[in-house]
Regions:
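Negatively charged, low-complexity tracts enriched in Asp/Glu with abundant Ser/Thr
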Residues: 1-35
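Short intrinsically disordered terminal tails
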Residues: 1-2, 101-110
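A short, sequence-level motif marking secondary-structure junctions
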Residues: 29-30, 46-49, 67-71
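Short Gly/Thr-rich strand-loop-strand
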Residues: 39-41
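Short aromatic-glycine-(Arg/Gly/Cys) micro-motifs in beta-strand/loop hairpins
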Residues: 44-60
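A short, exposed loop/beta-hairpin motif centered on an aromatic-Gly-Thr core
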Residues: 56-70
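A short, charged, amphipathic alpha-helix used as a generic interaction element across diverse proteins
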Residues: 66-83
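Anionic, Ser/Thr-rich low-complexity intrinsically disordered regions
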Residues: 80, 85-101
Length: 110
């Protein structure tokens, strides 16, 4: 694990229409290889109520909190990684990645 600043979507739903607002957070990063061989970078950030896991490329958070960072890392099992791997290929995921990219660009200009 390494220190990492990343963006997380501000939304309770994984709906690309509502995922256009992001906030920058500081935490830790870890690149994990999926069962199909894709490498995905995850961010781990601590909030007052627990640890959260975010796909760094899209800012989409896994909708569960964990007591410790190690429990959050352990939750990235083969089943969950397979779900994330499949999601990377759908259009909604690509739309969110595009929205995050535009948000970062606009944030740097402002």
């Amino acid at each position: 694990m390494y220190k990492l600043d990343f963006y997380t979507a501000i939304s309770n739903r994984n709906d690309p229409k509502t995922l256009n607002h992001f906030e920058r957070v500081s935490g830790y990063g870890q690149v994990v290889r999926t069962p199909r061989g894709r490498e995905i970078e995850f961010g781990f950030d601590k909030r007052s109520d627990g640890w959260y896991v975010t796909d760094v490329a899209s800012g989409m958070r896994i909708p569960k909190k964990y007591d410790t960072r190690m429990k959050a890392l352990a939750a990235l099992n083969a089943e969950l990684l397979s779900k994330v791997d499949k999601a990377v290929e759908n259009d909604a995921y690509k739309a969110v990645v595009k929205a995050l990219s535009e948000f970062k660009t606009n944030s740097e200009v402002a």
